[in-house]
Amino acid sequence: MAVLSAPGLRGFRILGLRSSVGPAVQARGVHQSVATDGPSSTQPALPKARAVAPKPSSRGEYVVAKLDDLVNWARRSSLWPMTFGLACCAVEMMHMAAPRYDMDRFGVVFRASPRQSDVMIVAGTLTNKMAPALRKVYDQMPEPRYVVSMGSCANGGGYYHYSYSVVRGCDRIVPVDIYIPGCPPTAEALLYGILQLQRKIKRERRLQIWYRR
């Protein structure tokens, strides 16, 4: 067996075999290129692509961009969800609000009134009779408002997809921002969905869009 050696290091034996069994294999650096006889070896390395954010065109747009960052920071740090538990997924939603996961440390506080909420968590099976109530609660929420679809039943009907009394996805009634798969999804999955919603809010540019009109 060959002896492995690196520059600056002494050769060592493997499994007690002598170095005379085979030729020594020199360790190659990570960034060293392999020399080949083909024409591709003479081609220069391509530069890495860099995503450069567009610079503000004026001072006013710069101020508006900073205001957007400030508003988005305050908005994503104080999400107040409206509980809309419809089935077994609501148990995991309550589990996330319990001390084990402590959702309050992310600024997420459940509210009982839709007029004080900016997030709706649709947890469970949405039936045809419950659909008008869901839309009514959504219309009572102030702007900007977000919807989290929790579980397979809320996403697309789930186990009751072919039932005559079930809406095949709550996105047919209200616009959905975050989909959380699972039957039911765990509390960790719901918490991850809330964190993804915070990332989405961070990238919003509502004031810049208003300023450019």
UniProtKB/Swiss-Prot annotation:
<dbReference type="GO" id="GO:0005739">
    <property type="term" value="C:mitochondrion"/>
</dbReference>
<keyword id="KW-0431">Leigh syndrome</keyword>
<dbReference type="Pfam" id="PF01058">
    <property type="entry name" value="Oxidored_q6"/>
</dbReference>
<keyword id="KW-0830">Ubiquinone</keyword>
<keyword id="KW-0411">Iron-sulfur</keyword>
<comment type="subunit">
    <text>Core subunit of respiratory chain NADH dehydrogenase (Complex I) which is composed of 45 different subunits. This is a component of the iron-sulfur (IP) fragment of the enzyme.</text>
</comment>
<feature type="region of interest" description="Disordered">
    <location>
        <begin position="31"/>
        <end position="53"/>
    </location>
</feature>
<dbReference type="GO" id="GO:0048038">
    <property type="term" value="F:quinone binding"/>
</dbReference>
<dbReference type="GO" id="GO:0097060">
    <property type="term" value="C:synaptic membrane"/>
</dbReference>
<keyword id="KW-0004">4Fe-4S</keyword>
<feature type="binding site">
    <location>
        <position position="183"/>
    </location>
    <ligand>
        <name>[4Fe-4S] cluster</name>
    </ligand>
</feature>
<keyword id="KW-1274">Primary mitochondrial disease</keyword>
<dbReference type="GO" id="GO:0005743">
    <property type="term" value="C:mitochondrial inner membrane"/>
</dbReference>
<dbReference type="GO" id="GO:0032981">
    <property type="term" value="P:mitochondrial respiratory chain complex I assembly"/>
</dbReference>
<dbReference type="GO" id="GO:0004497">
    <property type="term" value="F:monooxygenase activity"/>
</dbReference>
<keyword id="KW-0813">Transport</keyword>
<comment type="similarity">
    <text>Belongs to the complex I 20 kDa subunit family.</text>
</comment>
<keyword id="KW-1278">Translocase</keyword>
<dbReference type="GO" id="GO:0051539">
    <property type="term" value="F:4 iron, 4 sulfur cluster binding"/>
</dbReference>
<dbReference type="GO" id="GO:0046872">
    <property type="term" value="F:metal ion binding"/>
</dbReference>
<dbReference type="GO" id="GO:0002020">
    <property type="term" value="F:protease binding"/>
</dbReference>
<dbReference type="InterPro" id="IPR006138">
    <property type="entry name" value="NADH_UQ_OxRdtase_20Kd_su"/>
</dbReference>
<comment type="function">
    <text>Core subunit of the mitochondrial membrane respiratory chain NADH dehydrogenase (Complex I) which catalyzes electron transfer from NADH through the respiratory chain, using ubiquinone as an electron acceptor. Essential for the catalytic activity of complex I.</text>
</comment>
<keyword id="KW-0479">Metal-binding</keyword>
<dbReference type="GO" id="GO:0043025">
    <property type="term" value="C:neuronal cell body"/>
</dbReference>
<dbReference type="GO" id="GO:0016655">
    <property type="term" value="F:oxidoreductase activity, acting on NAD(P)H, quinone or similar compound as acceptor"/>
</dbReference>
<keyword id="KW-0408">Iron</keyword>
<dbReference type="GO" id="GO:0009060">
    <property type="term" value="P:aerobic respiration"/>
</dbReference>
<dbReference type="GO" id="GO:0008137">
    <property type="term" value="F:NADH dehydrogenase (ubiquinone) activity"/>
</dbReference>
<keyword id="KW-0520">NAD</keyword>
<keyword id="KW-0679">Respiratory chain</keyword>
<keyword id="KW-0249">Electron transport</keyword>
<feature type="binding site">
    <location>
        <position position="153"/>
    </location>
    <ligand>
        <name>[4Fe-4S] cluster</name>
    </ligand>
</feature>
<keyword id="KW-0999">Mitochondrion inner membrane</keyword>
<keyword id="KW-0379">Hydroxylation</keyword>
<feature type="modified residue" description="Hydroxyarginine">
    <location>
        <position position="111"/>
    </location>
</feature>
<dbReference type="InterPro" id="IPR006137">
    <property type="entry name" value="NADH_UbQ_OxRdtase-like_20kDa"/>
</dbReference>
<keyword id="KW-0225">Disease variant</keyword>
<dbReference type="GO" id="GO:0045271">
    <property type="term" value="C:respiratory chain complex I"/>
</dbReference>
<keyword id="KW-0809">Transit peptide</keyword>
<dbReference type="GO" id="GO:0042776">
    <property type="term" value="P:proton motive force-driven mitochondrial ATP synthesis"/>
</dbReference>
<feature type="transit peptide" description="Mitochondrion">
    <location>
        <begin position="1"/>
        <end position="38"/>
    </location>
</feature>
